[in-house]
Amino acid sequence: MGKVIGIDLGTTNSCVAVMDGKAPKVIENAEGMRTTPSIVAFSDDGERLVGQPAKRQAVTNPERTFFAVKRLVGRRYDDPMVEKDKKLVPYKIVKASNGDAWVEADAKTYSPSQVSAFILQKMKETAEAHLGAKVDQAVITVPAYFNDAQRQATKDAGKIAGLEVLRIINEPTAAALAYGLDKAKAGVIAVYDLGGGTFDVSILEIGDGVFEVKSTNGDTFLGGEDFDMRLVSYLADEFQKEQGINLRNDKLALQRLKEAAEKAKIELSSTTQTEINLPFITADQSGPKHLTMKLTRAKFEALVDDLVQKTIEPCRKALKDAGLTAGEIGEVVLVGGMTRMPKVQEVVKQLFGKEPHKGVNPDEVVAIGAAIQAGVLQGDVKDVLLLDVTPLSLGIETLGGVFTRIIERNTTIPTKKSQVFSTAEDNQNAVTIRVFQGEREMAADNKILGQFDLMGIPPSPRGMPQIEVTFDIDANGIVNVSARDKATGKEQQIRIQASGGLSEADINKMVKDAEINAAEDKKRREAVDAKNHADALVHTTEKALAEHGAKVEEGERRAIEDALGDLREALKGDDAEAIKAKSNTLAQASMKLGEAMYKQQAEADAAKDAAKDDVVDAEFTEVDDDKPKKSA
């Protein structure tokens, strides 16, 4: 078995590491750098450039230079965040045949997985040159908040690059592995990971070689690229005020602004003022124009303050989900290049009440952790156990459009859970299983991952068939769902495929809006529950009335029929209180019917007892009260 490498496939930069004996080692690329820009370009003659060579020619070739493509992985073309990106990047983002966002150069389109694969190939070649041997297996990191489709797309990228991806590992978890491998001290740590394109926070408990993730949260569209773009917008606005020329219409100028913004951002982490100087940025009838501007750290911090503040809420939610307070966190580990920014460090210190740990290299720590996990899988690293979690709840749509969770968020993976559901109609011979991911009460408000049909259910009254739905999440966080009719043994399963990722509006909407809209969600959920209860009451009352209606007086029967009519009418609307009231009226009216049924049964039993000489003790068996839930 050859060496298994660890790769941090980043939005802005990527890094590769390998276990060198007992210690992980970051490998330098052909340019002598320990990190490689996650940039792919195509030259005039069609040559593909990756990394530093691609970055060097970006200013003169902006339309064929792809950067930050990781942010498009698993995203739909009509995603609001893609719309935003389209206005800011100089290259062309196009709509693929499946509705995903792809990129285009020289009339040829590339999926984000393909572009990621070009970067992975570069990392693979870097490792092979260092090791002097072929490499075909890797552990690749992804943001903790990546969904199933995005993880699958990352595995696909590895495959395209000629790598068997042994494990997909979350970036904050990898960082924790690197931080805690040689530390004997047990405790709880928080990993604050603000990278080039994504933000993650994970709370972990470390002790005796066990790294257990307690909770995770994040934002898949928040990172250094947003800070750069905020500064680009400011520079473009200021230039337009002074010169009356909109640089956003000039792709060459836009690329120069992007490079200048990134450079200024980095410089302002170690100095309080920098100068941006871009001669001949554009020209008009009066001649060439130059952009010269002094930028202070205070001004830059004011421009991006809301972006820094956006990291606070996910941290609070992660603490809440872990059942911990900020004071119970022993150490805060900073990961990602953006954590070098003094303002970010200040916010982290205020939030957790302690100085963050700066003993790890934020650009390399994730790749080092991936290499350690590779060593664990290869057997080179002993006594290390990694227990990660799934970031969002998974479940199916049930009667009335309700989202029924089968696996809750922050459940340790790998995991497998089943739940029994039933049919909603008499003689229903098929059910559609619609799989969702999110935190809202109604399925439609969450992200649909896929759907499939279970056919051939034997004709029977509703509520009778038992359909067992099983969710299986592997250690990579990739989902398999199966449904089985317990009576016939017929089974259907689906591996959720990457048909488009969770957008910013989708992912964050799931968790953030869940709290904002909690009251509305509760109201809608109550309405559905009331309807389901009322529907069942109508069904059982109609059946009882047909079988035993003759045993009650005419006036009582008419009262039941009137109450039935009123409830049916109420069911046409969505007023939960009205449905509950009409349900109670019907339940009261039906009591006489129930009494008549019990009376008849009691008389029959008495007749049987009279015919017997001996009294025989009854045998009791325990009955499971859990009735199957109804599925659409």
UniProtKB/Swiss-Prot annotation:
Molecular function as annotated in GO: ATP binding; ATP-dependent protein folding chaperone; unfolded protein binding
Modified sites of kind Phosphothreonine: 198
Induction (free text): By stress conditions e.g. heat shock.
Keywords of this entry: ATP-binding, Chaperone, Nucleotide-binding, Phosphoprotein, Stress response
Presence of the UniProt keyword Chaperone in the record: yes
Cross-referenced InterPro entries: ATPase_NBD, Chaperone_DnaK, Heat_shock_70_CS, HSP70_C_sf, HSP70_peptide-bd_sf, Hsp_70_fam
PROSITE patterns, per the entry: HSP70_1 (PS00297), HSP70_2 (PS00329), HSP70_3 (PS01036)
Xref: HAMAP family: DnaK (MF_00332)
Role description: Acts as a chaperone.
Similarity comment text for this entry: Belongs to the heat shock protein 70 family.
Protein name: Chaperone protein DnaK
Gene for this chain: dnaK
